[in-house]
UniProtKB/Swiss-Prot annotation:
Modified sites of kind N-acetylthreonine: T2
Outcome of swapping D312A: Loss of adenylyl cyclase activity in the catalytic fragment
Organism of derivation: Mycobacterium tuberculosis (strain ATCC 25618 / H37Rv)
Binding positions for substrate per the UniProt entry: K261, D312
Keyword Glycoprotein annotated: no
Residues given in the record as ATP binding sites: R298
Entry protein name: pH-sensitive adenylate cyclase Rv1264
Organismal lineage: Bacteria, Bacillati, Actinomycetota, Actinomycetes, Mycobacteriales
An individual GO BP term: cAMP biosynthetic process
Domain Guanylate cyclase intervals: 217-325
Domain of life: Bacteria
């Protein structure tokens, strides 16, 4: 390389360093030089601060090319209105002008795939709903993947160039594995859903899936004192604790019990049959109680008619179970009388021990709710088929 060319290159790099000075400027200069060698354009570098992961972003489809919604519509033969609905469903910024060149090319291609499903006869509204649910789930997965990858390459004293090279090298090996892994996991979920969610007689007669509510039992379990714990430990430690609870709940959950979601320091489980759900919740509380690294757990359970929408559940038992959890004592599994009713004439037959905790008025719930504590073991006799017990926390949620 001649001195003239080297001086020109140095001038170009200098233009991309902004107002950095000293060691930071020298470190950024090495990164920028490497990025240019990887084919990253100066405009991309200027638009990204810091540009550590630009080379890695190229590996996952960000080539710096932007297009308009109309271009995507015309290039892929997708209805413009459907495309814009799908773009909003996946979380892209709302842009009313279809000719605005603001969409990443790869993002546009992903959204355009929805057209094919509509052509196969699927309801466009349902296609948009599926896209939204996928995007929400995959956004959480992407966040976890980012943290996992960075944890693998970050080292004390690592320079910007070290991180950029390490990220590119690792992700280049990971990218070919992601598609097959996600496909396999999705198919696994579809298989289990088809196994546990058979088409019922009413749906066959109606000729369509019935959207109405159905009888289920709902449970919430949350960590006691989690909010106060946030005042004495770091946010990262809190997140790790909540993640451990979610992982433990998933480990203990098997069909017909479904792990639905986490809400901060709480987990939500649902089952068509109350007995397997009670068994799972009792196991969860028992395991947490034996782990000194966990705060104590409490759980609330209720049965009733609820409806499923986009992976979540809505209805009276959801509200009641949440409120019951809020009045349970640490280490207790507290259930509404609707659960005993759902179990039928012999609630003790499944090996549960019941104790009456009294009636309670719960915020947002009409009338008093009769509450029981459920444990494992032989049945204790008493008034109403259950012994008297005081398992209510001192204040209503």
């Amino acid at each position: 390389m001649t001195d003239h060319v080297r001086e020109a290159d140095d001038a170009n790099i200098d233009d991309l360093l902004g107002d950095l000075g000293g060691t930071a400027r020298a470190e950024r200069a090495k990164l920028v030089e490497w990025l240019l060698e990887q084919g990253i354009t100066p405009d991309e570098i200027r638009a990204t601060n810091p540009p550590l992961l630009l080379a890695t972003r190229h590996l996952v489809g960000d080539d710096g090319t932007y297009v308009s919604a109309r271009e995507i519509s015309e290039n892929y033969g997708v209805d413009l209105e459907l495309l814009q609905r799908v773009q909003r469903a996946v979380g892209l910024a709302r842009v009313d002008d279809p000719d605005a060149v603001v969409h990443m090319r790869a993002d546009g291609e992903a959204a355009a795939r929805a057209q094919r499903f509509v052509e196969l006869g699927l309801n466009p509204d349902q296609v948009v709903l599926v896209v939204r649910v996928l995007a929400e789930g995959l956004s959480h997965a992407a966040e976890a993947m980012r943290y996992t990858a960075l944890e693998a390459i970050m080292r004390p004293g690592a320079t910007e160039l070290d991180i950029a090279k390490g990220s590119q090298a690792l992700v280049s090996q990971i990218v070919p594995l992601l598609g097959p892994m996600i496909q396999d996991m999705l198919f696994m979920q579809l298989r289990h859903m088809m196994e546990t969610e058979a088409v019922n007689a009413g749906e066959r007669a109606a000729g369509k899936p019935l959207p109405g509510a159905r009888q289920v039992t709902v449970a919430f379990a949350d960590l006691v004192g989690f909010t106060q714990l946030g005042e004495v430990v770091s946010a990262e430690e809190l997140g790790h604790l909540a993640g451990r609870l979610a992982g433990l709940a998933r480990d203990l959950t098997a069909p017909p019990v479904w792990f639905i979601k986490t809400i901060g320091d709480a987990v939500m489980l649902v089952c068509p049959d109350p007995a397997p759900l009670l068994d799972t919740v009792l196991k969860l509380v028992e395991v947490v109680d034996t782990d000194n690294n966990f705060p104590r757990l409490r759980a609330g359970v209720a049965s009733g008619m609820a409806v499923s929408r986009a992976g979540d559940w809505f209805g009276s038992p959801v509200n009641v179970a949440s409120r019951v959890t809020g009045v349970a004592r640490p280490g207790a599994v507290l259930v509404a009388d609707s659960v005993r009713e759902a179990l039928g004439d012999a609630p003790e037959a499944d090996g549960f021990q019941w104790s009456f905790a009294g009636p309670r008025r719960l915020r947002g719930i009409r009338g008093d709710v009769r509450l029981f504590r459920v444990r494992r073991g032989a049945t204790r006799t008493g008034s109403g088929g259950a012994a008297q017990d005081d398992d209510l926390a001192g204040s209503s949620p």
